[in-house]
């Protein structure tokens, strides 16, 4: 769902246009979620990571961009979705020239890297302001769930119950990970 808004985004930092990722955020992008879904530390569902600066030129990756278990959205994601104002997006950074440097005591990977600070104003300088802005953007969404069975067969009661379970979890996931700034329905039209 996040591909509707992200991640083909760049930032203009000191006159240089920096891609923040292709279809997902670059691995070195600091992208912690604003409203975690399952764990206290989660990287954005759109990619990037949660990075700890070790203050010695190395960075520990506390969470990565894998989707299992499900994760939420960073403030940058929420801004691009029209669910956060620019003032809500904290400064972040992108790590470039990542070189593996070991693992910490918990097994998290450590990298040497070059850190570049990025602000939402840098993103706006490259992409322009989000239109419509947070005050005028869409907040209610509707998605469909399709149940497929072999030709001539009807879906079983169990299959319908599973689809309804997915629907309920999807609606809860969306509300939680957007900080209840947006709602999702699953109503066939």
Where do the language-model regions lie?
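Active-site recognition of the HExxH zinc-binding catalytic motif
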Residues: 1-15
